[in-house]
């Protein structure tokens, strides 16, 4: 029967809509949708298709699940369809967590659950894209100066606010951005415990997090001065904002000064404050 078939194919809540409807069998493409659901669930502690329509159902039986997850799947944050928004008091996790994350992550979820539903062959977010976005999210973390909880750097929100990083999502204290470094298209927040890896500074070593190449460190005699320590085996070349050039040998540091440019081999990183 239908329930038996679904039980063999997977759990409806985490299956691609075309599999729930019975139009397709599990495949690489349907697995990509399931991966997106799992990542959304992990970060939002909520299901991307469970909103007002799910809340209106009294008994979540097989026909109801087939409707929500298969025949009429609507993303709870679809920018063009508000018919399935999260319901306060029922879907509070989705409402709380969605606003915490930066726009680039929200955008990829929107793509995964709009185009990824309407165009399964071309709209799904691939695993390699998720890897890049998860690293980008990790690099965007910075800490609230009041409660020390993690917040996220969002360049879009920063531009829209005229450079104001806003308030901490947890304690509502005013946030202060730490120094950051731009390497190519990537931006990494330079917190007290930040480390840069080969992935960040060498395009030939994507996803290489085997050992750090740089680490934020405090000046040994002046705790108010922070720097980036070379913990690799290679020499760096630093150009200050004033134009002076110096070498930074392994185990030496460069101050986190506005406009300083660090040449890590072929890659160049610029310090922003």
Residue spans for each PLM region:
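C-terminal boundary/linker segments immediately following FHA domains
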Residues: 239-273
């Amino acid at each position: 029967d239908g329930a038996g078939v679904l039980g063999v194919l997977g759990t409806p809540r985490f299956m691609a809509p075309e599999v729930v409807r019975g139009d397709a069998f599990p495949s690489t493409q349907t697995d990509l949708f399931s991966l997106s659901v799992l990542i959304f669930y992990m970060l939002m502690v909520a299901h991307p298709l469970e909103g007002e329509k799910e809340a209106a159902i009294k008994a979540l039986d097989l026909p109801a699940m087939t409707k929500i997850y298969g025949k009429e799947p609507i993303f709870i944050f679809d920018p063009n369809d508000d018919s399935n928004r999260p319901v306060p008091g029922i879907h509070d996790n989705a409402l709380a967590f969605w606003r915490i994350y930066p726009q680039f992550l929200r955008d990829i979820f929107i793509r995964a659950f709009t185009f990824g539903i309407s165009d399964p062959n071309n709209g799904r977010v691939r695993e390699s894209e998720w890897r890049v976005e998860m690293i980008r999210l990790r690099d965007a973390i910075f800490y609230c100066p009041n409660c020390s909880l993690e917040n996220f750097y969002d360049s879009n929100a920063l531009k829209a606010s005229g450079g104001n990083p806003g308030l901490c999502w947890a304690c509502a204290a005013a946030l202060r951005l730490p120094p950051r470094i731009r390497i190519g298209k990537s931006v990494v927040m330079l917190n007290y415990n930040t480390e840069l890896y080969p992935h960040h500074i060498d395009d030939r070593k994507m996803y290489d997090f085997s050992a750090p190449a740089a680490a934020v460190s405090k000046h040994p005699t002046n705790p108010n001065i922070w720097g980036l320590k070379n913990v690799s085996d290679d020499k760096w070349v630093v150009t200050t904002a004033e134009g002076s050039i110096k070498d930074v040998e392994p185990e030496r540091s460069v101050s986190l000064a506005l406009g300083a440019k660090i040449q890590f081999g072929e890659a160049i990183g610029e310090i922003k404050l």
